[in-house]
């Protein structure tokens, strides 16, 4: 990851460069942040924190970034984006948005796969519709996260769609998120990139 950040021009055409680290409940998290930011911080725009559950998770990452930037003399201010992908995170989403805005927080992403597991929900496709549920089973959660983002000036990003062989359903999922007010959706397969860029213009 560090070598890729150093060697390739990821920031061309105004792209935001973000690195997903391990979650705070692992012993890898702090080394992820220290190594990536100390060695390639000038090429980085944000850190993506998975499984954010409380406002203190964002504060911890922000405090670590403060220390690294001060210690290394890094002039670039690195932002924070988070994944809401647990029931704890969704229960605290408004508080996280409110306090996180003062701690570098710029965006929230809906991590539907782990969120479904956290809810013990029955799903057929990651990010897709369930034929046993009338409508979109994630509508309430997406709306709740969106309100928190809009109330406190954060970007709202929808998460992945798992069936690479169903481009139509990916496109429909992206359009549903856009209709709610989401600013983007994950593209986790090359085919998604082409679909997303063409549909984003619509």
Positions of predicted regions on the chain:
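Expand to "…catalyze enediolate/carbanion chemistry for C-C bond making/breaking, isomerization
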Residues: 1-198
């Amino acid at each position: 990851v560090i070598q890729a950040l150093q060697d390739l021009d990821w920031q061309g055409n105004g792209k935001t460069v973000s690195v997903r680290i391990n979650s705070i409940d692992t012993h890898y998290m702090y080394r992820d942040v220290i190594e990536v930011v100390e060695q390639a911080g000038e090429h980085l725009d944000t850190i993506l924190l998975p499984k954010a559950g409380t406002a203190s998770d964002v504060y911890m990452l922000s405090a670590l970034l403060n220390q690294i930037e001060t210690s290394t003399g890094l002039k670039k201010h690195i932002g924070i984006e988070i994944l809401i992908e647990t029931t704890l995170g969704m229960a605290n989403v408004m508080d996280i948005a409110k306090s996180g805005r003062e701690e570098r927080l710029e965006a929230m992403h809906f991590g539907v796969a782990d969120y479904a597991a956290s809810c013990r929900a029955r799903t057929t496709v990651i990010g897709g519709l369930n034929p046993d549920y009338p409508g979109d089973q994630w509508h309430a959660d997406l709306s709740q996260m969106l309100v928190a983002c809009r109330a406190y000036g954060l970007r709202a990003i929808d998460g992945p769609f798992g069936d690479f062989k169903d481009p139509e359903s990916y496109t429909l999922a992206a359009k549903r998120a856009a209709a709610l007010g989401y600013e983007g959706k994950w593209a986790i397969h090359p085919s998604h990139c082409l679909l997303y860029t063409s549909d984003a213009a619509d």
